[in-house]
């Protein structure tokens, strides 16, 4: 979906009353939400943050109960469950493996076909779907932050599968919400911060890419900031970007994490990362956008609060909080 077709689904065009529906908070009952992918990095954050909140009752489903690799069984798996919100935090995320024949097919099944089935099932019940996507739907040829109205043009199979999922979700209902995230990290699962700390502790030299720019995203803050938009007085719909500005390279992000760790007394073999161009790295089969910084202005306008700078989350990312 490129160019003009995408704009039919952007910025909440299909959302009732535009970008969001505001209701009297006193009239809004506690909602029941079914969560997929609750054992993952994002799903774990959603479970942790939402579990104690009075406005939502969270019902996690395991992969054994609903397997996205079997889209034709999704409707039966949801049969008999009552819910107001379906949250899809599950995905095929093996970016490089998606370039193989089997990986490409699996990515499209999970990220594309299954996402569409979930969207249709939720819409048929009058429920909302909260679905997550990625900055990898862009080709990286811009030199300013991508907005929700910018056309997509994924470079690899993973990004293409996520783009297809976005399209199918937004076609199914104007109430559904797709949130694009980038460089996700959090306490539920190891990600880049844990990798760079482990490498710096074990090796005298650690090479990190310096010519790819995006924005880190702290998963618990995603959960905290999204809850009012799906279970609060303002219901967000359509397409949203959420990440922590400003844009940075993996090198800059990793170096700042090491700086925090060093200041906290963590023993490291190297305290200074070595820059490397992404083209010089081996083992990356999938092309990646060189620039995929996303603009979060629409999120700020709907929620009433801008996303925090990623440096504010450095102590948590470095495991010091």
Task: Annotate each language-model stretch with its function.
Residues 95-100, 134-155:
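Active-site "gating" loop of Rossmann-like NAD(P)-dependent oxidoreductase/epimerase domains
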Residues 100-130:
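NAD(P)-cofactor binding segment of oxidoreductase domains
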């Amino acid at each position: 979906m490129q160019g003009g077709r995408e704009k039919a689904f952007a910025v909440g065009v299909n959302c009732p009353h535009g970008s969001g529906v505001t209701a009297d908070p006193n009239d809004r009952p506690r909602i029941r939400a079914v969560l997929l992918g609750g054992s993952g990095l994002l799903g774990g954050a959603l479970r942790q943050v939402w579990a104690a909140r009075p406005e939502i009752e969270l019902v996690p489903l395991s992969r054994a109960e609903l397997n996205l690799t079997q889209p034709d069984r999704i409707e039966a798996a949801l049969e008999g469950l009552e819910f107001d919100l379906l949250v899809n935090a599950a995905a095929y995320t093996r970016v490089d493996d998606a370039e193989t024949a089997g990986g490409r097919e699996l990515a499209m099944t999970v990220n594309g076909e299954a996402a569409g089935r979930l969207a249709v099932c939720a819409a048929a019940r009058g429920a909302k779907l909260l679905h997550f996507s990625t900055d990898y739907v862009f080709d990286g040829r811009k030199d300013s932050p991508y907005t929700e109205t910018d056309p997509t043009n994924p470079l690899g199979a993973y990004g293409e599968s996520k783009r297809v999922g976005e399209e199918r979700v937004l076609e199914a209902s104007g109430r559904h919400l797709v949130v694009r995230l980038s460089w996700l990290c959090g306490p539920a699962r190891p990600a880049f911060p844990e990798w760079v700390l482990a490498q710096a502790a074990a090796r005298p030299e650690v090479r990190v890419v310096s010519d790819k720019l995006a924005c880190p995203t702290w998963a618990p803050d995603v959960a905290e900031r999204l809850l009012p938009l799906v279970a609060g007085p303002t219901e967000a719909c359509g397409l949203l970007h959420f990440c922590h500005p400003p844009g940075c390279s993996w090198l800059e992000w990793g170096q700042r994490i090491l700086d925090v760790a060093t200041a906290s007394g963590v023993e490291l073999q190297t305290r200074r990362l070595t820059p490397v161009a992404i083209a010089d790295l081996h083992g990356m089969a999938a092309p990646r956008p060189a620039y995929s910084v996303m603009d979060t202005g629409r999120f700020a306008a709907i929620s009433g609060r801008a996303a925090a700078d990623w440096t504010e989350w450095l102590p948590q990312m470095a495991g010091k909080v």
